[in-house]
């Protein structure tokens, strides 16, 4: 995307979660329209600049893509500093990555405080491999939003960024007026699959709200 107007604001986004959950894939889908079929563990951090052309002007999000593996844990706090928003990703087909959402959130809040956060359950195109049991619906009590996504099928890949921009700009009516470059999906995400996922997440959101640090993920 080549915007015709000057960037109105630049925001730092920290992208965290266990290795293999699709963090780098999400960034590359927006940056190049490509999906990485082979996963390579990110070494340290990669910073990618994503431009979003909205009805409120052009905004840039600098996405800090950190390594999700524990051996890099000592480096994470430094990358969290001055982050204005965050995405925490887990793989709906991996219970381990789902179980670690609470830990990632705790580490993030300890450094950054109450910044806007999106929790993304990625790979919902693999419905038959789903292992998580219930949603992590924090948005009614904290500054967090839960979304289902599939980077491989392009399902909801723009939604986390639009939500965060609305929070950061303070305008719930903010919309994209030009979509980032995204290639056709690698798999077809049918309407029926979409209805199943939406039903599952709506059911989770109707459950009594737990205390964030006492959640049995």
From Swiss-Prot:
GTP binds at residues 18-25, 36-42, 68, 122-125, 150-152. Its main location: cytoplasm. The keyword Transit peptide does not apply. Residues 68-84 are annotated as: Switch-II. The keyword Protein transport applies. Residues 7-171 form the Small GTPase Ran-type domain. Found in a nuclear export complex with RanGTP, exportin and pre-miRNA. Interacts with tamo. PANTHER family: GTP-BINDING NUCLEAR PROTEIN RAN (PTHR24071:SF0), RAN GTPASE (PTHR24071). NCBIfam families: small_GTP (TIGR00231). This is GTP-binding nuclear protein Ran-like. It comes from Drosophila melanogaster (Fruit fly). The lineage of its organism: Eukaryota, Metazoa, Ecdysozoa, Arthropoda, Hexapoda. The gene is Ran-like.
């Amino acid at each position: 995307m080549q915007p015709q107007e000057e960037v109105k604001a630049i925001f730092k986004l920290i992208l965290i979660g266990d290795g293999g959950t699709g963090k780098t894939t999400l960034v590359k889908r927006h940056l190049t329209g490509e999906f990485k079929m082979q996963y390579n563990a990110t070494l340290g951090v990669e910073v990618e600049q994503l431009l979003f052309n909205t009805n409120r002007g052009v905004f840039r999000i600098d996405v800090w893509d950190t390594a999700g593996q524990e051996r890099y844990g000592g480096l994470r706090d430094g990358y969290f500093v001055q982050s204005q928003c965050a995405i925490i990703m887990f793989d709906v087909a991996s219970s381990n990555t789902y179980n670690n959402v609470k830990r990632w959130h705790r580490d993030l809040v300890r450094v950054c405080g109450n910044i806007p956060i999106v929790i993304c359950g990625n790979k919902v195109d693999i419905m038959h491999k789903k292992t998580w049991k219930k949603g992590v619906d924090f948005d009614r009590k904290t500054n967090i939003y839960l979304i289902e996504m599939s980077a491989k099928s392009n399902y909801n890949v723009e939604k986390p960024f639009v939500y965060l921009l609305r929070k950061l700009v303070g305008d719930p009516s903010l919309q994209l007026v030009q979509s980032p470059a995204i290639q056709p999906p690698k798999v077809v995400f049918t309407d029926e699959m979409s209805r199943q996922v939406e039903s599952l997440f709506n059911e989770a959101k109707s459950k009594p709200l737990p205390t964030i640090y006492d959640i049995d993920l």
